[in-house]
A protein has these predicted regions:
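Long extracytoplasmic/lumenal interhelical loops at the membrane interface
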Residues: 195, 298, 308-368
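Short aromatic-rich membrane-water interface segments that cap or initiate transmembrane helices
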Residues: 122-128, 193-208, 313, 320
């Protein structure tokens, strides 16, 4: 069939027909192991931001993930119908119910008309990555990713991309930005990435904040995984990835991301049943925070010096955030649930009473 189409039809048609057997084989494999498509989704999610900077994607990125999650759910349903593998009860766990509660809150938030108007398109655009995707991911993981072997394979995959991200950040720091990155910086990111304390590097992510937060999560996850892994090669790999994540966190210059390893170790201490590992984590947590807050160790290093500003109540950048919070407090009595999901700069008119709230930096919008 492939030979006949190649000799009698246009190249594009022949290629499409020739790929049908491979596509059917791939679908069959994914029905047997839906986790393969989940890993592909993870890979795309990790690199699509960088791809979009060099080759702008003509459709909304959320549409791509709508398609991927839709295919995954379809394959899972087919597997449930045609096999005896029924693990749906595994999805009934605490995390699923927490996400269901969060989804319900987000759905209710669709009726938030505090600005005088509803914005269903903006709400739906934010609802998917904030609530629907996490719930679907939890559902898929609970049903089909319930073996330690998958966890190790997934951590290896995650570790490889963490190393790639940290390496790209290292390249930016030591070799400089390429022409596309410089064009983006001068057009959009210079104000937030060229600051008085130095340059904030962003690897192949959308910005330094996302890069730093991702590296902080990787640092915490792989450090804890290294503590528990019994395979010495995996233990070494996890530890190297953790250090790479910590390096990425440093060069990103995102102080808010430091909260991720602090919170991660704190939660681990609460959940840990191994007192030796728990004590080690406690000493690292207290020692790290104490070093940054009460000492001048590493003050000559620009990266450590910037991290230390997180705990400096007189830091100018932190004071700006406090000023934003003071301005927002005037609105909070009127809008305790905010102005609506997705109501950001460009959505509401500058003449709207709540325009300031829509343009206020997101990391300053949570006011006690």
């Amino acid at each position: 069939l492939c030979i006949w189409t190649a000799t009698t039809m246009k190249a594009t048609v022949a290629t499409a027909i020739g790929l049908i057997p491979f596509l059917l084989t791939f679908i069959f494999i994914c029905i047997k192991r839906p986790t393969i498509l989940l890993c592909i989704t993870f890979i795309i999610n990790y690199i699509i931001m960088g791809i979009n900077r060099y080759y702008p994607i003509p459709i909304p990125i959320t549409n791509i993930f709508d398609l991927l999650f839709g295919i995954m759910l379809t394959l899972i349903i087919l597997k449930q119908v045609y096999t005896d593998d029924d693990n749906r009860k595994n999805a009934m766990n605490a995390y699923t119910f927490v996400l269901l509660g969060w989804l319900l809150y987000c759905i209710i938030n669709a009726g938030n008309g505090i600005t005088g108007e509803l914005y269903p398109e903006a709400w739906l655009r934010i609802l998917r990555p904030w609530a629907i995707y996490p719930l679907l991911t939890c559902f898929i993981l609970s049903i089909h990713c319930n073996r330690y072997s998958f966890l190790h394979y997934f951590l290896i995959l995650w570790g490889i991309f963490t190393l790639l991200a940290a390496t790209k950040g290292y390249w930016q720091k030591n070799k400089g930005f390429d022409s596309t990155e410089l064009a983006w910086l001068w057009a959009y990111g210079a104000r937030t990435h060229f600051i008085h304390s130095g340059i904030r590097y962003f690897s192949f992510f959308t910005d330094a904040a996302i890069f730093g937060s991702t590296m902080g999560l990787s640092c915490t996850t792989f450090f804890l995984s290294a503590l528990y892994s019994k395979n010495r090669y995996l233990k070494l790999f996890y530890f190297v990835v953790s250090m790479a994540g910590f390096y990425g966190l440093l060069i990103a210059g995102t102080r808010a991301a430091i909260a991720i390893p602090i919170a991660g170790l704190g939660v681990f201490l609460f959940l840990s049943k191994n007192w030796k590992i728990g004590m080690l984590s406690f000493l690292l947590l207290v020692g790290g925070v104490g070093m940054l807050k009460y000492t001048k160790i590493g003050e000559d290093n620009r990266l450590i010096r910037r991290m230390r500003t997180v705990f400096d109540s007189n830091d100018q950048s932190l004071l700006v955030r406090f000023e934003n919070q003071k301005a927002l407090k005037a609105y909070m009595s009127e809008m305790p649930f905010g102005i609506g999901m997705g109501v950001q700069n460009g959505v509401i008119s500058p003449q709207n009473k709540y325009y300031f709230v829509s343009i206020c930096p997101a990391d300053s919008s949570l006011v006690d």
